[in-house]
Regions:
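Class I S-adenosyl-L-methionine-dependent methyltransferase catalytic core
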Residues: 1-217
Length: 217
């Protein structure tokens, strides 16, 4: 079986809140933490490898538990932080520039704050999402020291993550064997696996996971 140096994933977390979980299930199939833990990721991970995993503030503990269950040790909980802008924020920025309503730096900051996505939250309203990095063995050598943490991107389709993060991971770790789990489509240079992915590159067997893994060159 092919082994991967870099494993990137956005797990389909199952919310305990019925409203939140129902909203997620309207767009994709969610999976319990128990079943996620039993996905045999350790069988495809190289002896020295890196896991980059998306999670929200509701799933901090679960993300750490899942990384451990897959054989990884979390090294940083905030390798990347995506600041979410409303899907049409770019149009309103362009309009403000054309109309001359941005007079100074403070105007720009006000508009940036106004255009960040306002999600739910029991304390503050969430408008960011994080990627942790965990390692197995010695992990991977860092190929670039100029990769930044914060990603500013507009929202796409429901739960769709910005392509910029995969690009930065490529810069960070170079040309290694890499795969995206729970993928919805294929990316050049990446293998992929997921029940919505048109061409899977590997086979996983488990309680809910039987499918097959493909690389786009």
């Amino acid at each position: 079986m092919k082994k991967y140096d870099l494993i990137y994933c956005d797990p389909p977390w199952q919310y305990s809140n019925k409203v939140s979980n129902g909203a997620a299930n309207n767009h994709y199939q969610t999976t319990s933490l128990f079943d996620l833990k039993h996905l045999p990721v350790h069988t495809i991970a190289a002896e020295n490898s890196v896991l980059a995993m998306w999670y929200t503030g509701n799933f901090v503990q679960e993300a750490f538990e899942l990384a451990k269950a897959w054989g990884f040790t979390v090294r940083t909980s905030k390798a990347f932080t995506w600041i979410k802008f409303n899907s049409l924020a770019h149009e309103r920025f362009d309009k403000a520039l054309q109309n001359g309503t941005l007079f100074d730096f403070h105007d720009m900051l006000d508009l940036l704050n106004a255009e960040t996505k306002m999600n739910g939250g029991n304390y503050t309203r969430a408008n960011s999402e994080d990627v942790l990095i965990a390692t197995r063995g010695n992990g991977l050598e860092r190929m670039s020291a100029s990769v930044k943490q914060v990603v500013f991107r507009c929202l796409g389709e429901h739960s769709q993550k910005p392509w910029e993060v995969k690009n930065r991971l490529e810069q960070l770790y170079g040309d290694v064997n890499r795969i995206e789990l729970f993928a919805r489509d294929m990316s050049q240079g990446w293998d992929a696996w997921g029940n919505e992915c048109p061409n899977n590159s590997i086979e996983f067997t488990g309680p809910q996971f039987i499918t097959k893994a493909v690389t786009i060159d």
